[in-house]
């Protein structure tokens, strides 16, 4: 079982840790976070307001901003995912989850984290800060063998499970798991393109609030309206998720682009893919091929539903993407709007774990 370190114990760092314990596929041995103490880590891991109390191997965590007690708190309690249903505590300077002790670091400089001493072979870079090959590569200096960036990267190879993961080569030391939205869009786009051909398309993601947004109106380093209060507004925003599909499906490069609407919900987002098809297809034909993919090569990653679902129905869902057969529409046999849901936190975190497992299988 591959031994994993987590850098940054924020939303994705904690949920990757949860996903790791739930799946039993990887061993978390260390965590780094300079802003959270150990007891707070325990709390934050165990209680999650969205996903509930923790139910799950991780060997090290780094977060320079959280002391150990705070780590305990943040892991235990989560406003989105609910209280952690296992045991989590701080003991002898370590974070102990279900009896499994995890080494804690609080380094701001990733090159100073002694991942090797903790036994961490793979590092999940989940701070959102060290997203380039050069910056993420600092983890290798501390003894890590490979780094998985849990965000899009300007220059690291990007992989989406079920889409292009088979192209991973063990010579690669640093990779990106792309974004949650790319992980939702790419499997659906692949199925549609493989069966009917996508001439061109526009994507819109209606996206839940994330930690980068403001609780009340404040200054934004990007677009001014990005600084509007997240709970008060629907905010048009940019996203590179659709263009990134062209990196994982080269045949679609230059054929897709998109935007986002940030909406005041805590979790779960939805993709609207409006595209022109090369081959004619009835909407029932599209439903059929998507369902076949869900039951076949994309099982566990792409889901399918004909129920009258809403966003909260997907809270805690581990799929990358769930096609909503009843929500899509067709103007004609060549022009369609397709809808797919995703838990932008938990579904994505499960794919981070799956990517590490796949990489380890190539060692």
Curated annotation (Swiss-Prot):
There is a cross-link at residue 214 (Glycyl lysine isopeptide (Lys-Gly) (interchain with G-Cter in SUMO2)). Its main location: cytoplasm. The modification ADP-ribosylcysteine is found at residue 180. Coiled coil: none annotated. Residues 1-176 are annotated as: Interaction with WARS. Belongs to the glyceraldehyde-3-phosphate dehydrogenase family. This is Glyceraldehyde-3-phosphate dehydrogenase, muscle.
